[in-house]
């Protein structure tokens, strides 16, 4: 056994005792969790930290209460080491309401706002972009904090790893990336998954200074972590610490462990960090007779108390099932601070830009980031001139890494900033769907209400510009399917101008879909000093005979169709959804109650569409108001083609809306 004190700082006896106590505390907690799992007290997946305790103990000893921690699904030890009380962690393992996430997260999703513990993350590599965003928020606010991000060797194969380290190095952010390299990603050996098995070289290639340390030696880990934390606190940018470690137990309780040799496991157990430190302390006269037994007794008592309290704690009542999906927005939304007092003649592009300028001028927490939004001025020129006006810290060009910078936006929102993330086009958002759906939409719920995500994501959507199948789809209904997200689709100049301010006042993640065919459209912007209500649909044209229901880029076509129908003696009411999630069902049902017929115009595909959802709502809630079948006008079910005539044929056009309206009125077969 190597001497753990060689090449390391001299530590006091009290300090070494504390390191030993912390490792023992984590080990005993995890062992008890295994027992409780076999008794079916803990369910789901259980990933224990047994064998790896030296990593968390050594690194986290150097963190302060203001520093942030982002972890993995094997995070029980990190949570305990980050000052979350054991009783709250154990209650969460049980799924009880007294747990640190109110029982909503369970073993893989421990959170605590007071401890600045931003969660276990069950998506491999999913926490790395969040850590980047937390550090970015601190840097923008001038706070001297560090974010420690723990992950395994498997995460180093994920795109999020490369995107996150690149962003952190590019922006010189105070992130300590801690790779707990236990040689296996679930059951896949490092050598089978990585052509380059020296993980420090991956970090160095991305511009992050890196070091590798024996992760079974708590003193060595602490010393390496302290060196890196010193550099971080000095403003020297991110650091990468690889800790070579080993888990003594299976990946999870369902793992038969057929992929590693028993002799290998036993060889690593010979390097167990707990006896390694304890035996060295005994030989050095630093661990006195009876002291370890006393530590074990204290830990056992704490553990028994935590289990007893978890057993006695209440389950969250079913009546609260729908809690923690959204944070309640303010009942009174502050009006836009820079609302115009006179009408303006302008384009939708200019209206969107006015909204951005207002947000940046009147809320110092707001910043904009995305691809080509600064020097280039935005793919659709919405942000042109903003870099010169607000500077590169707040108009932040990003690499082509949608998942990375969107996740960083989510992390920045967790860190008290108000980010506006621009994704160039909806098709590119699919590269960020992991972070949008698995993080932005779920963090409030998984944390039991501990962490909201006040984030705005803007993106272009829709077809009509002859840019074919990878830049042209209308996929907003996919996001409207997801609880935890709010989805907006402006179709008027007033909404283009004022929706952003309202979205920034909302404490939830808000996605704004800007139809590409609106950017060049011009009109008169009437002043709206009270702002817009992003909870409600809007009646854009009253009528008594037929409800035309639409949103976004289809609104101008629908209004044109309504005008043509009026010439035929049909008074159509035009309902602009504006808000795709949560839908304003009351306005929809009320409109149908007046007109008794409905045509839904939706640029998405018909199968699984928003139009289908609205039709179902009307059938469920207003069936007896219907005098005719509901009609849907949607895009033909093909990828958007390039040729102009085929693209036009695929998309809903005024003639299609008119034909559907006439069928609903019984005037056309």
PLM features: what roles do these ranges have?
Residues 57, 115-308, 312, 374-450, ...:
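Thiamine diphosphate
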Residues 31-35, 39-171, 192-195, 200, ...:
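Cofactor-binding active-site loop characterized by glycine-rich and histidine/acidic residues
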Residues 466-549:
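Phosphate/diphosphate-binding glycine-rich loops and adjacent basic-rich segments that engage nucleotide
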Residues 1-55, 243, 248-249, 253-390, ...:
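Conserved acidic/glycine
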Residues 36-42, 107-121, 144-150, 183-184, ...:
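Glycine/charged-rich beta-loop-alpha catalytic/anionic-binding loops adjacent to active sites
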Residues 73-78, 114, 151-157, 179-185, ...:
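Acidic, glycine-rich active-site loops and adjacent beta-strand->loop/helix elements
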């Amino acid at each position: 056994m190597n001497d753990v004190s060689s090449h390391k700082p001299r530590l006091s006896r009290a300090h070494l005792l504390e390191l030993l106590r912390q490792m023992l505390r984590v080990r005993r907690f995890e062992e008890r969790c295994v027992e409780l799992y076999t008794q079916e007290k803990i369910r789901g997946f259980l990933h224990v930290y047994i064998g790896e305790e030296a990593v968390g103990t050594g690194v986290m000893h150097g963190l302060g209460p203001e520093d942030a921690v982002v972890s993995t699904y094997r995070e029980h030890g990190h949570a305990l080491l980050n000052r979350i009380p054991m009783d709250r962690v154990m209650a969460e393992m049980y799924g009880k309401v007294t747990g640190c996430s109110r029982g909503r997260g369970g073993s893989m999703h421990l959170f605590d706002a007071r401890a600045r513990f931003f969660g276990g993350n069950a998506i491999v590599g999913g926490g790395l972009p969040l850590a980047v965003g937390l550090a970015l928020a601190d840097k923008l606010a001038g706070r001297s904090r560090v974010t420690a991000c723990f992950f395994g060797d498997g995460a180093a194969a994920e795109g999020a790893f490369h995107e996150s380290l690149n962003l952190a190095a590019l922006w010189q952010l105070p992130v300590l990336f801690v790779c707990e390299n236990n040689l296996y990603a679930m059951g896949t050996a490092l050598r089978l998954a990585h052509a380059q098995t020296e993980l420090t070289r991956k970090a160095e290639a991305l511009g992050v200074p890196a070091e590798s340390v024996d992760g079974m030696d708590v003193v060595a880990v602490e010393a390496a972590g302290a060196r890196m934390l010193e550099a971080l606190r000095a403003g020297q940018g991110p650091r990468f610490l690889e800790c070579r470690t080993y888990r003594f137990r299976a990946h999870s309780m369902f793992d038969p462990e057929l992929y590693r040799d028993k002799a290998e496991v036993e060889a690593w157990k010979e390097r167990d960090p707990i006896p390694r430190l304890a035996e060295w302390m005994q030989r050095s006269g630093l661990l006195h007779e009876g002291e370890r037994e006393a530590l074990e007794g204290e830990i056992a008592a704490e553990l028994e108390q935590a289990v007893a309290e978890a057993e006695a704690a209440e389950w969250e009542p079913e009546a609260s099932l729908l809690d923690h999906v959204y944070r309640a927005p303010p009942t009174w939304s502050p009006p836009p601070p820079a609302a115009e007092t006179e009408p303006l003649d302008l384009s939708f592009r200019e209206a969107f830009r006015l909204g951005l300028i207002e947000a940046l001028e009147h809320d110092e927490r707001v910043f904009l980031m995305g691809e080509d939004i600064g020097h280039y001025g935005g793919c659709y020129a919405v942000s042109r001139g903003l870099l010169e006006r607000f500077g590169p810290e707040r108009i932040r060009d990003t690499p082509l890494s949608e998942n990375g910078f969107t996740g960083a936006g989510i992390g920045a929102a967790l860190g008290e900033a108000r980010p506006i993330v621009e994704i160039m086009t909806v098709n590119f958002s699919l590269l960020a769907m992991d972070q949008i759906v698995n993080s932005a939409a779920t963090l409030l719920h998984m944390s039991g209400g501990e962490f909201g995500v006040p984030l705005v994501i803007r993106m272009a959507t829709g077809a009509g510009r002859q840019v074919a199948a990878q830049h042209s789809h209308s996929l907003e209904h996919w996001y409207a399917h997801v609880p935890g997200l709010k989805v907006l689709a402006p179709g008027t100049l007033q909404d283009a101008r004022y929706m952003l301010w309202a979205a920034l006042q909302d404490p939830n993640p808000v996605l704004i879909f800007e139809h590409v065919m609106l950017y060049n459209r011009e009109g008169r912007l009437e002043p709206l000093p009270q702002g817009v209500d992003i909870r409600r649909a809007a009646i854009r044209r009253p009528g008594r005979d037929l409800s035309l229901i639409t949103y976004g880029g289809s609104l101008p076509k629908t209004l044109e169709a309504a005008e043509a129908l009026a010439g035929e003696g049909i008074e159509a009411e035009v309902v602009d959804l504006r808000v795709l999630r949560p839908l304003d069902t009351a306005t929809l049902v009320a409109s149908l109650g007046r007109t008794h017929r409905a045509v839904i115009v939706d640029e998405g595909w018909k199968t699984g569409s928003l139009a289908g959802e609205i039709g179902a709502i009307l059938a469920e809630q207003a069936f007896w108001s219907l005098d005719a079948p509901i009609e849907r006008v949607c895009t033909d079910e093909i990828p958007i083609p390039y040729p102009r005539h085929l693209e036009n044929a695929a998309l809903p056009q005024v003639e299609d809306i008119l034909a559907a309206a006439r069928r609903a009125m019984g005037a056309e077969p």
